[in-house]
């Protein structure tokens, strides 16, 4: 099936007399006829449902849909994008390990990797996404367990060279994890380019309406965990009757382990209602992404021609540094987020933003409504000046999330903002 059809039909097929729309199963628990049956489910939680702390029929339908959209073997939803990022790392890293990440990633992820992971005894080694192969290779250590990057970085809009980083990661016997939030599987499917694990903040384009907070992890099912670097996958799990994930769940051992261990212990699972809302957003994802891309390229060209704008970052522009990579990985478009640097720095940026009427000042992105943010004052506020530079952010940078309003109205709003500075 094509992705437009998958968004509507994957994950849930109603039987005779059942609801057409994925139903909300608002229940914490599930009933069995005998204690023996419950015991059997606890021996192998993949056979049936136990408790809504880590599985639910509504969420299960969404997980199956997203796995299909990304071309993966299985998926696990989480209560936020940050929870997905955290679980994706902790599933295969422990104290004493290290991992490699692109410098051009979301500010909250940088805080997670630089501060919280360090407190857990896990080292994050950053590399410039434009580094040479030799420079990237030099970052690897004997204890390195994975490589991490974002398809389209938030907010610098760097396009991550997935295939190149995948090849280097695999050469070193470790998986590549890609955050595909901004691209969505409509614009890019990282697994097709060599990524092993794909994550999302589903609060963004997948939802599209700013009504639920969530995340998801997708297991490609393709990575070979038996190379000796991942005893957590290949040796008995003492918390689950000595289960060896690569042997018992060879179709998707990574995601099964994440659910049976991390979700069981952390409980960062979304509510059934959140999953229901997410599914509604997914059903219109292709239609929305087409319009986001169409509106954004028009707005980006307008900004590029404005003499009060110092620079524009939007990979869809032919002048953009990452346009060639965008043509390779994102041939249908580069989503709806634009970053631009306004002349005059931070104070001028604030005056411009405060003068807008249509675009909302808010800590969100990828909504159907146009919104705007000053990253250095908000999402990346906790970073040092050095970290801001490494992430491609300066005081005059504004992140514009182009919505689905008529593009002429969006541009008119920007024009009156420029007139105020």
Which residues are covered by each model-predicted region?
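PLP-dependent enzyme catalytic core of the Aspartate aminotransferase-like
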Residues: 1, 114, 123-124, 138, ...
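Conserved C-terminal alpha-helix-loop-beta "cap" of PLP-dependent enzymes
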Residues: 289, 297, 303-304, 308-398, ...
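Short amphipathic alpha-helical segments
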Residues: 47, 73, 213, 274-278, ...
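Short Gly/Pro-enriched turn/cap motifs at secondary-structure boundaries
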Residues: 15-16, 206, 267, 328-330, ...
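Conserved PLP-enzyme active-site core in the AAT-like
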Residues: 4-13, 75-305
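Short, acidic Gly/Pro/Ser/Thr-rich loop/turn segments
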Residues: 15, 31-35, 224-225, 285, ...
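Conserved N-terminal alpha-helix of the aminotransferase class I/II PLP-enzyme fold
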Residues: 34-86, 108-117
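N-terminal "arm"/small-domain region of PLP-dependent enzymes with the aminotransferase-like
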Residues: 1-56, 64
């Amino acid at each position: 099936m094509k992705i437009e059809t998958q968004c509507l039909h994957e994950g849930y097929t109603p039987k005779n007399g059942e609801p057409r729309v994925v139903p909300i199963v608002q229940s914490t628990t599930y009933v069995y006829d005998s204690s023996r049956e419950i015991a059997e489910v606890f021996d192998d939680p993949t056979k049936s449902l136990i408790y809504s702390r880590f599985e639910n029929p509504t969420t299960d339908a969404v997980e199956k849909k997203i796995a299909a959209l990304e071309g993966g073997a299985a998926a696990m939803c989480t209560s936020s994008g940050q929870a997905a990022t955290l679980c994706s790392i902790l599933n295969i890293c422990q104290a004493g390990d290290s991992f490699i990440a692109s410098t051009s990633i979301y500010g909250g992820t940088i805080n997670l990797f630089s501060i919280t992971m360090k407190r857990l005894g896990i080292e994050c080694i950053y590399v410039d996404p434009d580094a040479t192969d030799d420079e990237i290779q030099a970052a690897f250590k004997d204890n390195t367990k994975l490589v991490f990057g974002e398809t389209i970085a938030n907010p610098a809009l760097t396009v991550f060279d997935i295939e190149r980083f995948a090849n280097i990661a695999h050469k070193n016997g470790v998986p590549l994890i890609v955050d595909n939030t901004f691209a969505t599987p409509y614009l890019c499917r990282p697994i097709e380019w060599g990524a092993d694990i794909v994550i999302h903040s589903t609060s963004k384009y997948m939802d599209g309406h700013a009504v639920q907070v969530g995340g998801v992890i997708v297991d490609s099912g393709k990575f070979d965990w038996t190379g000796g670097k991942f005893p957590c996958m290949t040796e008995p799990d003492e918390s689950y009757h000595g289960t060896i994930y690569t042997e018992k769940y060879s179709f998707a051992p990574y995601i099964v382990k994440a659910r049976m261990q991390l979700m069981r212990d952390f409980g960062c699972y979304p509510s059934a209602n959140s999953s229901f809302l997410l599914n509604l957003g997914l059903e219109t994802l292709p239609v929305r992404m087409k319009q986001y891309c169409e509106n954004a390229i028009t707005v980006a060209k307008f900004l590029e021609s404005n003499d009060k704008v110092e620079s524009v970052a939007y990979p869809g522009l032919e002048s953009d540094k990452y346009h060639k990579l965008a043509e390779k990985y994102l041939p249908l478009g580069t989503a709806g987020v634009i970053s631009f640097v306004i002349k005059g720095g931070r104070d001028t940026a604030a005056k411009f933003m405060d003068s807008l009427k249509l675009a909302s000042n808010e800590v969100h992105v990828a909504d159907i409504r146009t919104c705007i943010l000053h990253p250095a004052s908000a999402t990346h506020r906790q970073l040092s000046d050095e970290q801001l530079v490494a992430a491609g952010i300066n005081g005059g940078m504004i992140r514009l999330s182009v919505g689905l309003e008529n593009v002429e109205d969006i541009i008119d709003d920007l024009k009156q903002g420029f007139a105020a500075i």
